[in-house]
From Swiss-Prot:
It holds the Pfam family tRNA-synt_2b. This is Threonine--tRNA ligase. Catalyzes the attachment of threonine to tRNA(Thr) in a two-step reaction: L-threonine is first activated by ATP to form Thr-AMP and then transferred to the acceptor end of tRNA(Thr). Also edits incorrectly charged L-seryl-tRNA(Thr). Binds 1 zinc ion per subunit. Keywords: Aminoacyl-tRNA synthetase, ATP-binding, Cytoplasm, Ligase, Metal-binding, Nucleotide-binding, Protein biosynthesis, RNA-binding, tRNA-binding, Zinc. Zn(2+) binds at C334, H385, H510. The lineage of its organism: Bacteria, Pseudomonadati, Thermodesulfobacteriota, Desulfovibrionia, Desulfovibrionales. It is an enzyme of class 6 (ligase). InterPro entries: aa-tRNA-synt_IIb, aa-tRNA-synth_II, aa-tRNA-synth_II/BPL/LPL, Anticodon-bd, Anticodon-bd_dom_sf, TGS, Thr-tRNA-ligase_IIa, Thr/Ala-tRNA-synth_IIc_edit. Homodimer. It catalyses: tRNA(Thr) + L-threonine + ATP = L-threonyl-tRNA(Thr) + AMP + diphosphate + H(+). GO terms for molecular function: ATP binding; metal ion binding; threonine-tRNA ligase activity; tRNA binding. Residues 242-533 are annotated as: Catalytic. It is found in: Cytoplasm.
């Protein structure tokens, strides 16, 4: 039989190991760096027998995204073997590769400790040094159940009973460990060259709070020790930038068990930051032709039933009873916007209608996934819904994409765009999907925006563009979304009268720019390590006196800068200047303005930046102009205007 390898046609025999076939077509160095292969696009072990109907083979390199996922999956198996060796009574459950690492969940009588993790990692290194082969066998399900029953692995039995269809299962073995697994895996344990266990946490079996609590051990693995070292450095840097730590340090927000999980309490400085962002959003939306609207926090259950949320989303909603009627606390803002559109007769001349709301929403997130500002139960969403004619769709999408570019750039982020297309289960005609997808593509291409295609990952009601921010540690964060929707206009019977007098259905776009304001602020704090841009800093400048002799002059300078719209405060404590400077730097204040005898005599202030740079003595007018210009600079790129200095 003939197979194609990198545009070469090669003679091969059915049943021959795929790795053996590849060895005749690629260099030994590349083969040595391979961890698996693709058979007609499907990932397989290098030892996988070549099917007689195979057409194409390709290597999976260790440092490729797929290769790293396979290495991490194999590392999870190696970890499970180590845990079973050290703690024989443990039960194993599942151990997948995840983004940037892997985990395995174990049922054990007590939590694992940091000392346990060290011992487990040392045991893993023994297996890796032994270079044990991974082997795959296919056995009758009944035989596999007998094997795991004899080992007391009740979770594996449940998986086979509830999740595996068919009479045959695949088992992977290495060393003394056998696991139920689809694979693929690296050829030998020695190819897991760089591995590190990171942490342990509780996790409910199948994510169900009513099921047993398991012990989840997280780890990561890379193709090289250098890559692992870089990643571990990023983890340490991320700890320093943790928004929860910085939020407390900068006195921005807090969480309290007395209030409840996932509910943030905003302190004065944090609320000021929010207010500045929200005021900016309102003004920018008005400037770009949106109408500001507001809907109620709770709506009758019948509306959620009509929209489909009750059937598809109610587990994430909160409900309450009022006057013997059921109400849902809104998890999103769209329903009120539908009713605003429907409140009057619409002509084609009235379109587009753009409704914007900074709406507070509530979603019942599981307690195990709550994480500071990044995952909360109450948050504010910068929601907008655009209803337009089909011929206006591309222009509207282009406008939203440009809006996203301007706002993301203002906050200093780079970003990536991803197009999610029609899934297998969807509503709407082929014509609707083709038109909407083309409009999304044309909008991005018209402004030269690169994008990746995520086939089949659109919502059942329409395709979408997802914008993922790249932060200072090269992490990706989902924030902005532009979503076509064929469902709600139909369910709410939204129409307009066309030029020919016919009733037509408008096209609808859901979109958010920042997404959840809380989540965005959490990302921004970590991106900037708390050193927010000057325009957004709750305190933009602090005047520091050297002795009481400068206090009267400093108070005059304070009043002058406040008149100029600067958010400034005075530190007139009887402390050493160095202490005051360090404290201001810890608080991430952009400008430290020192008032000593020399500055008092000259009628100015010595300007120091939080970076440590000293700009020398400036007059009060120069200081005011400098800080104002610093605030205005980021806005110029998007043709926007800064006017939030005097909050």
């Amino acid at each position: 039989m003939q197979v194609t390898i990198e545009d070469q046609s090669l003679e091969a025999a059915a049943g021959e190991a795929c790795g053996q076939v590849l060895s005749r077509a690629v260099s030994g160095k590349r083969l040595k760096n391979a961890v698996a292969c693709l058979v007609d696009g499907q990932p397989r072990d290098l030892a996988f027998p070549l099917p007689e109907d195979a057409h194409e083979l390709a290597l999976v390199a260790a440092d490729s995204p797929m290769g790293l996922s396979i290495i991490r999956h194999s590392a999870a198996h190696i970890m499970a073997e180590a845990v079973k060796t050290l703690f024989p009574s443990v039960q194993v459950t599942i151990g997948p590769a995840i983004e940037n690492g892997f985990y395995y969940d174990f049922a054990y009588e007590r939590p694992f400790t940091p000392d346990d993790l060290e011992a487990i990692e040392a045991e893993m290194q023994k297996s890796i040094a032994a270079n044990q082969p991974f082997s795959c066998t296919y056995v009758p399900k009944a035989d596999a159940k007998a094997l795991f029953a004899a080992q007391g692995e009740s979770y594996k039995l449940e998986i086979m009973d509830e999740n595996i269809v068919g009479d045959t299962v695949s088992l992977y073995r290495h060393g003394t460990f056998t696991d139920l697994c689809r694979g693929p895996h690296v050829p030998t344990t020695g190819l897991v060259r760089a591995v590190k266990l990171l942490s342990v946490a509780g996790a409910y079996w199948r994510g169900d709070e009513k099921r047993p609590m398991l012990q989840r051990i997280y780890g990561t693995a890379f193709a090289s020790a250098a890559d692992l070292k870089t990643y571990l450095h990023h983890i340490e840097e991320a700890k320093k930038r943790d928004h929860r730590k910085l939020g407390a340090q900068l006195d921005l927000f807090s969480f309290s068990e007395e209030v409840g999980a996932g509910m943030c309490i905003w302190h004065p400085k944090g609320e000021l930051i929010r207010t500045i962002i929200e005021d900016f959003e309102r003004r920018e939306h008005l400037r770009r032709g949106y109408d500001l609207v507001r809907g109620p926090l709770i709506l009758r259950r019948e509306l959620w039933e009509r929209s489909g949320h009750y059937d598809n989303y109610r587990e994430n909603m909160y409900f309450t009873e009022i006057d013997e009627q059921s109400y849902g606390i809104k998890p999103m803002n769209c329903l009120s916007h539908m009713l605003i559109y429907k409140s009057r007769v619409r002509s084609y001349r009235d379109l587009p209608q753009r409704y914007f709301e900074l709406g507070v929403v509530h979603r019942h997130e599981k307690s195990g996934v709550l994480h500071g500002l990044l995952r909360v139960r109450q948050f504010t969403q910068d929601d907008a819904h655009i209803l337009c004619r089909p011929d206006q769709l591309q222009e509207e999408i282009t406008g939203v994409v440009r809006f996203v570019q301007d706002v993301v750039g203002l906050f200093g982020f780079d970003f990536e765009a991803e197009l999610s297309t029609r899934p297998e289960k969807s509503i709407g005609s082929d014509e609707d999907w083709d038109r909407a997808t083309k409009a999304l593509v044309d909008a991005m291409e018209s402004i030269g925006l690169p994008y990746e295609v995520n086939e089949g990952d659109g919502a059942f009601y329409g395709p979408k563009i997802d914008i993922k921010l790249k932060d200072a540690l090269d992490r990706r964060w989902q924030c902005a979304t532009i979503q076509c929707d064929f469902t709600l206009p139909e369910r709410f019977d939204l129409v307009y009268t066309d030029a020919d007098g016919e009733r037509k259905r408008p096209v609808m776009l859901h979109r958010v720019i920042l997404g959840a304001v809380e989540r965005f602020l959490g990302v921004l704090i970590e991106h900037t390590a708390g050193a927010l841009p000057t325009w957004l800093s709750p305190v933009q400048a602090r005047i520091l006196i050297v002795t009481d002799a400068q206090k009267e002059f400093a108070e005059q300078a304070l009043a002058r800068l406040k008149e100029a719209g600067i958010r400034v405060e005075l530190d007139d404590r009887n402390e050493k200047l160095g202490f005051k400077v360090r404290e201001a730097q810890v608080e991430k204040i952009p400008y430290m303005l020192v008032a000593g005898d020399k500055e008092k005599e000259l009628g100015g202030l010595n300007v120091r930046l939080r970076s440590g740079e000293n700009l020398g003595v400036k007059t009060l007018d120069e200081v005011a102009l400098m800080i104002t210009a610093d605030c205005q600079e980021p806005f110029k790129r998007g043709g926007m205007r800064y006017n939030f200095c005097s909050q």
